[in-house]
């Protein structure tokens, strides 16, 4: 038995800890090694997303570190397929999340996953290093180009999310239905009316936005779906920089611009031009062409509006079903996002796209 294993995450209130501890003992060789838990660190713990922890163990005099993550079963399946099947199928298996094992709790409501720990090599968006950013871009472009027209897209679509224009259309429709069903108190009525009008406007713009994707969106491909820099690791090795993409929980199928827009928005506007230039050069090497920046801005805006609309749904359902007190706070935050939305790329005034927002 690994010393201290019985206390792993004992004060977190998480489900499935018994199953997690048994899996950790198997992975660490608890029957033969002299081992002990030395540290646990919470990396992420939010009510509506995965809970992530770093665990460190002393094993026969050396320190071993791993990441454990509590996820919903449907998200586990996407991450598992990305790590074990999709990425290896196109020669990118060693650029994935390093999944070691998974175990479902008795209720079937959640799954623990154990991953390799890639240390503090997360991509820095505040002070971006060009070489590391380019290594990350090279990997993402490889994913996009290798999966365009790939026969696995049908499987990816079945298990993953639809992130094209259908995502925009269905998300906006669902957000409107959920919000219309709320009965706001008088003090929240201005927010309610304002947010509804924003959603109606986004819905009415669908034909023009769908047409833009028809003309400029390019082929469907595998999308990471949550390409924040916190999910991109660039690791120094003896052979140079080695990029990895973690957290494939929200992966799916759609146009490459979905991932491009998410990635660019993590950086300050002053960095986006050179990052886009690097991206344009990389896709050109693969035989693709980046759309003109005016059209890119319009597509980026469309995808951000879809993401904002998606964030309306669960607070609105919470208000409709339970009058959840956090619901109006969440909706106020989303309303402010709509208000603050600006073009991803800064263009010359005469070259700027005419926004429909």
Where are these predicted regions, by residue range?
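Conserved NTP-binding catalytic cores of kinases and kinase-like/nucleotidyltransferase enzymes
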Residues: 1-109, 235-243, 353-357
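An alpha-helical support segment within catalytic cores of ATP-dependent transferases
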Residues: 26-31, 152, 174-224, 350-354
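Active-site acidic catalytic loop and adjacent metal/ATP-binding pocket
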Residues: 42-58, 62, 204-258
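Conserved structural core of kinase catalytic domains
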Residues: 101-135
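A glycine-centered beta->alpha junction motif in the catalytic cores
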Residues: 114-127, 145, 149, 177-184, ...
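A cross-family kinase active-site recognition segment
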Residues: 126-194, 220, 332
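All-alpha amphipathic helical-bundle segments outside canonical DNA-binding/catalytic cores
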Residues: 158, 288-304
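Active-site activation/catalytic loop segments of kinase-like enzymes and analogous catalytic loops
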Residues: 253-288, 304-326, 333-341
């Amino acid at each position: 038995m690994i010393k201290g294993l019985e206390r792993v995450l004992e004060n977190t209130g998480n489900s499935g800890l018994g199953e997690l501890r048994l899996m950790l003992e198997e992975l660490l060789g608890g029957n033969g090694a002299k081992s002990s838990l030395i540290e646990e660190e919470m990396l992420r713990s939010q009510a509506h997303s995965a809970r992530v922890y770093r665990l460190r163990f002393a094993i026969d005099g050396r320190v071993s570190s791993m990441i454990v993550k509590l996820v919903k079963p449907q998200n586990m399946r996407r991450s598992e397929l990305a790590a074990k099947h999709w990425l290896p199928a196109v020669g990118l298996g060693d650029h994935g999340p390093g999944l070691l094992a998974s175990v479902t709790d008795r209720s079937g409501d959640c799954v623990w996953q154990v991953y390799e720990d890639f240390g503090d090599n997360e991509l820095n968006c505040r002070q971006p290093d060009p070489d590391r950013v380019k290594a990350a871009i090279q990997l993402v472009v490889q994913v996009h180009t290798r999966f365009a027209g790939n026969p696995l897209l049908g499987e990816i679509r079945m298990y993953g999310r639809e992130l094209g224009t259908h995502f925009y259309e269905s998300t906006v429709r669902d957000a409107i239905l959920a919000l219309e069903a709320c009965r706001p108190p008088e003090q929240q009525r201005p927010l309610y009316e304002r947010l509804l009008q924003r959603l109606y406007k986004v819905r009415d713009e669908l034909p023009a936005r769908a047409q833009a994707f028809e003309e400029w969106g390019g082929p469907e491909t595998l999308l990471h779906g949550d390409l924040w820099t916190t999910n991109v690791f660039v690791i120094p090795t003896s052979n140079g920089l080695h990029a990895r993409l973690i957290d494939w929980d929200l992966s799916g199928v759609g146009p490459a611009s979905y991932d491009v827009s998410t990635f660019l928005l993590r950086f300050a506007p002053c960095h986006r031009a050179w990052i886009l230039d690097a991206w344009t050069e990389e896709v050109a090497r693969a035989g693709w062409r980046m759309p003109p920046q005016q059209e890119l801005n319009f597509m980026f805006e469309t995808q951000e509006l879809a993401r904002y609309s998606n964030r309306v749904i669960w607070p609105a359902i919470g208000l409709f079903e339970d009058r959840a007190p956090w619901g109006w706070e969440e909706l106020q935050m989303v309303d402010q996002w709509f208000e603050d939305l600006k073009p991803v790329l800064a263009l010359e005034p005469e070259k700027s796209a005419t926004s429909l927002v």
